[in-house]
């Protein structure tokens, strides 16, 4: 906001599915979502790569795969959350039934439940690193193809204006992903 004080930026947090719906219906101008996506009505650019971690109580047995946490409660966001879909796919990939999904509305709440030994959760390494209490859990990186997620900035085709372009430029100054053509994903 310091560089562009006249720009009115409103931020909203929601699962990727809900943000994409907001884009498609025109309620949102842009959204940060798990990608890449190939929707004919949207364009986007990758902003960052996130390492995904399964978090468990502090001293569990080793977690080598979903069979090691079968039947455990899973703390997650609503069904429209892309990380939840990834975790469900991780279980399905090895034909392991996922435990009961318990919907929690914050990462802090998920972490507290895991610290208490009530189940497991999936979150990005950067999110976990930002939370107090992160040292009270054990972390277990997922194997490919579930090990990482790329956060994309998405917008409706033809709606990339000067304000959004300037924001993209600011975000990409510290970017760690290889250069990608800004307008081509669909």
Regions found by a protein language model. Give the residues of each.
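Central regulatory/effector-binding core of bacterial HTH transcription factors
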Residues: 1-40, 104
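Hydrophobic residues within well-ordered alpha-helices
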Residues: 22-24, 69, 112-118, 153
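Residues embedded in well-ordered beta-strands
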Residues: 46, 53-55, 120, 138, ...
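Short secondary-structure boundary segments
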Residues: 35-36, 58, 125-127, 151, ...
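Flexible hinge/capping segments at coil-to-helix
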Residues: 39-79, 165
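Secondary-structure junction motif
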Residues: 73-94, 161-169, 178-183
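A late-sequence structural motif
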Residues: 138-181
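A ligand-binding cleft/hinge motif common to bilobed small-molecule-binding domains
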Residues: 35-42, 89, 108-137, 145
């Amino acid at each position: 906001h310091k560089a562009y004080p006249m720009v009115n930026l409103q931020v909203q947090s929601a699962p990727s599915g809900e943000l994409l719906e907001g884009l498609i219906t025109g309620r949102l101008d842009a959204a940060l979502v798990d990608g890449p996506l190939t929707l004919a009505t949207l364009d986007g650019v990758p902003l960052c790569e996130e390492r995904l971690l399964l978090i468990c109580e502090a001293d569990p047995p080793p977690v080598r795969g979903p069979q090691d946490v079968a039947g455990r409660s899973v703390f997650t966001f609503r069904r429209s959350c892309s990380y939840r879909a990834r975790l469900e796919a991780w279980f399905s990939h090895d034909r392991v039934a996922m435990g009961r999904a318990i919907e929690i509305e914050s990462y802090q709440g998920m972490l507290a439940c895991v610290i208490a030994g009530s189940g497991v959760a999936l979150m990005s390494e950067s999110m976990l690193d930002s939370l107090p209490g992160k040292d009270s859990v054990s972390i277990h990186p997922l194997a490919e193809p579930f090990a990482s997620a790329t956060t994309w900035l998405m917008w409706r085709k033809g709606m990339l204006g000067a304000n959004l372009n300037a924001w993209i430029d600011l975000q990409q100054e510290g970017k760690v992903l290889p250069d990608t053509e800004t307008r081509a994903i669909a």
